[in-house]
Amino acid sequence: MPVSAAATPAATDSATDAAVCAPLPVLGRDVLVPLVTGGEVEYAALDIAASAPALQRVWDDVAAYAPYYGSVHRGAGYLSQLSTDLFENSRAEVARFLGCREGDQVVFTRSTTDSLNLLAAVLPAHTRVFVFETEHHASLLPWEQRADIEVTYLDAPRTPQQAVDTLERALAEREPGSASEGFEKSGGGAQRSGNALVCVTGASNVTGELWPVRELAAAAHAHGARIVLDAAQLAPHHPVDLAELDVDWVAFSGHKLYAPFGAGVLAGRADWLQAAEPYLAGGGASRTVARRVDGGVDVDWHTTAARHEAGSPNVIGVYAIAAACKALTEAGFESLVAREQQLVERVRAGLAEVPEVTVLSLFGDDAPRVGVLSFVVAGWNSSHFAAALSAEYGIGVRDGLFCAHPLVRTLLGAGSQAPGECGAPEGAPGEQSLNAIRVSFGAGTPDEHVDRFVRAVKELVTDGARWSYRTEDGRCVPDTAAAG
């Protein structure tokens, strides 16, 4: 079936027609920061894609629990029992948020990166992994750590339909008797098995574009493969339902979901998780440990999520994720999506009025996206531009390659050997460099912060920076020894 905008995750008519909600209260909303030109201004946090501030409700819930903190699954006292119940109730809340199916497991980790490395660690030997080169490094790199895994890197698609077609062709070529030409592979010495895994993002951390997750999942399953969804950028903006999207696993981070307290999630099918050795060995992952007659040790590992949660768990981080899941659900994703789309259109319309600005995209300027846009400005070093937004306007954005080097190189038309490094300026202020600027926003972003950003871009392009800048320790910073 052809891929359309309506087939992308949660890109529904109801999101367009829903009532627009007010920004959700977030911690630090009224923080003032100094300007290099003098005075202070309310900080405009427009780097939500990197890490989101805590929802005020999440902070309040965590603060209310903190005096009652106790060890989880490790104590008979009241606070330990309360904390254990809170931890497991949080697991159930996350399962509801993700639409987990009967038999699915919710494993708590440190982050999306940790979740995908966990999945890589439990893959059956000789599994073939298919991943688009457009992925964040958290999705792109973990599979290479297994010498017995073969990885197929798929070229960047230019339309959602091309993404599905590319995946279907690659999966068909792995089947017995088929050729396997046209794709770059690693681990060529690995044996072949029937197991295959597709790893795909739900929303790009560079362009914000929504990927055709349902169609990719259908293609994977039609060819006997499984699929994991990197929802780090999707879950904070759109509902994620394992059953509805028909994905096998989903991974995301609390710090992207307005719960920045050091926890993440891997949720989905239990069989590979139960069959593999624990991701970490230690207390809590085992049911019994006994010495053998020969002097060794026999271990009976848990078959629940605890198998991969060795060590004292981060109950505050887990509770924060559950609180964020509940807060977003109660706020209503339809109204949250509707408001965010208004902000997206506001930024796109404003940047379109600046000829020097080029917004980066894979699927086209009108592709559905979450509140993430990356762009370059003709005649500007992106690091210099981002530094000026911060120092002169109190606006926090990100510059660099966004831990998605192959994708940004593709979008900028640069070869794989072109110099460039994530997050660091590659030239002096005013020189061109292989990096871009990213602006991102979400449930807590007020309209006036977006409007200030658009005005600042226009002023910088028209009038230039009002201050001098220099490179220091890999960062572009105001030169306080000289006025601009």
Residue ranges and their predicted role:
Residues 1-484:
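Pyridoxal 5′-phosphate
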